[in-house]
């Protein structure tokens, strides 16, 4: 639950469930508004998440919809879709640190869930 709460705080620009500002909104804005898309396009994961970027440990996997993800080793995810008002957390222990096929399948599944909320 704590990862979901953290994701929700990120989705709400740093505001916690109790309405308190936990981290400055400008910090969340900085992650969303500044990117490394040119560097990303030349990197190892460009095929996995085309058009994505990375900043401050967060992956911006869909810049048009503001989808933000934290990806951890062995299949951990925090998926944030602001427009759908959705946060999804996936805890896992996949056999290898990063399985591109699994990551793409999970991303498609998360996107489908978000689409159902829109």
Residue positions per predicted region:
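A short acidic/small-residue loop/turn micro-motif
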Residues: 94-96
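Active-site Gly/Thr loop motif
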Residues: 29-87
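Short, gly/Ser/Thr-rich active-site loops of penicillin-recognizing serine hydrolases
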Residues: 100-118
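Intrinsically disordered, low-complexity regions enriched in Ser/Pro/Gly/Gln/His and often acidic
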Residues: 20, 51, 98-100
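Non-transmembrane alpha-helical segments in soluble domains
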Residues: 4-11, 28-32, 57-59, 114
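A structural signal for well-ordered alpha-helical scaffolds and beta->alpha junctions
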Residues: 3, 24, 51, 106-110
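Structural helix-adjacent loops and short alpha-helical linkers that scaffold large soluble proteins
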Residues: 14-24
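Active-site-proximal alpha-helical segments within enzyme catalytic domains
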Residues: 1-15, 76-77, 81-92
